[in-house]
């Protein structure tokens, strides 16, 4: 009499491996740019924090600071460069970059147009 074996055949195992490979091929590109999204979020967050620091400094001294270390004691996130700040009469703008994102920067303008995207709203950080 013939006994039945319990377990999977080689074909069944190969089909499972192929299906897992297809699912991985679909999922990996969706998560590939997760790091760059995190870097952009850090740059935007730093610009929002800079708005708070600048306006706080302005309320104390009636001028906007251009030196983030001395005047405001502002420290950017890891990998984010110290923002470049330009001040005007009652307005200022700033841009920053990240060490892991080449040819990419974020900017913000307060009481003036955004230095990167002129259609951005007042105080809205935009990356390009």
How does the language model describe each region?
Residues 1-2, 56:
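Short, contiguous, well-ordered secondary-structure segments
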Residues 30-47:
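Aliphatic-rich helix starts adjacent to a transmembrane/signal segment
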């Amino acid at each position: 009499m013939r006994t039945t074996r319990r377990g999977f055949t080689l074909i069944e195992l190969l089909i499972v491996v192929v299906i897992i490979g297809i699912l991985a091929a679909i999922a990996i590109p969706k998560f590939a740019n997760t790091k760059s999204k995190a870097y952009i979020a850090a740059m935007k967050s730093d610009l929002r924090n800079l708005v708070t620091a600048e306006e706080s400094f302005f309320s104390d001294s009636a001028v906007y600071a251009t030196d983030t270390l001395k005047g405001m004691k502002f420290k950017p996130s890891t990998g984010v460069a110290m923002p470049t700040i330009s001040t005007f009469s009652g307005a200022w703008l700033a841009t920053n970059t990240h060490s892991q994102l080449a040819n990419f920067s974020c900017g913000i303008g307060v009481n003036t147009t955004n230095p990167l995207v002129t259609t951005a709203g007042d105080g809205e950080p935009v990356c390009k």
